[in-house]
Regions:
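Polybasic, lysine-rich low-complexity intrinsically disordered segments
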Residues: 29-32
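A solvent-exposed interaction/effector surface
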Residues: 34-188
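Glycine-biased, low-complexity coil/linker segments
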Residues: 3-5
Length: 188
């Protein structure tokens, strides 16, 4: 029997499908629904990013090939001051103002306490609060994670939302292939 409300194949002037048609159709539909759900990048407006005791280190262009080393140095710096990292790594990208904006990249980590004596290159805020952000939640292969930022840029364009150019990417969880990432983009 066909599904309720379905049109018989013969009504379209073609031969009826094999006996298993409704079952195969349902399987394909369910698989497609799962693929769609797993590949969805959720977007929301007017979200607030709040980080406490956040330690930041600016990354120079010459250091981009050594990001793993920089993260290890940050963790060692935190531990050497009797503090502990709290939560995931955050990457912040800001653009300089002027006729030729240049990206500035920062690695950030929240720590369990303020560090009293900072070495050159490090900055710390007791509370970093960024209100009114566009937000995207990405789950999937990390080599596609840039799609979250791209989707927010498209969303901002379609909804006439002005962005400042500052974005925070929070690497919530990740293994060798897949991961979870939250992206906050600052709005004007």
């Amino acid at each position: 029997p066909l599904l309720v409300g379905a049109v018989a194949a013969g009504d379209w002037g073609v031969e009826p499908f094999p006996h298993s048609f409704p079952y195969n159709c349902l399987l394909q539909t369910k698989k497609k629904q799962v693929d769609i759900i797993m590949r969805e990048i959720q977007v929301a407006e007017n979200k607030t990013l709040k980080l406490t005791n956040v330690l930041a280190r600016k990354i120079d262009a010459s250091e981009l090939g050594n990001l793993g080393v920089i993260l290890t140095q940050m963790q060692n710096f935190i531990k050497s001051h009797s503090a502990m990292p709290v939560g995931p790594v955050i990457q912040c990208v800001k653009f300089t103002s002027g006729p030729n904006p240049e990206p500035q990249i920062y690695f950030m980590m929240q720590v369990n306490q303020l560090i009293p004596r900072l070495e050159p290159g490090y900055e710390q805020d007791a509370v970093l609060r960024v209100k009114g952000c566009l937000y995207a939640h990405f789950t999937g292969p990390m080599d596609h994670s840039s799609l979250a930022s791209q989707k927010l840029n498209i969303y901002a364009y379609e909804h006439e939302i002005e962005l400042t150019g500052t974005a925070y990417s929070i690497y919530v969880n990740q293994d060798s292939e897949n991961g979870v990432m939250d992206v906050f983009m600052e709005t004007k």
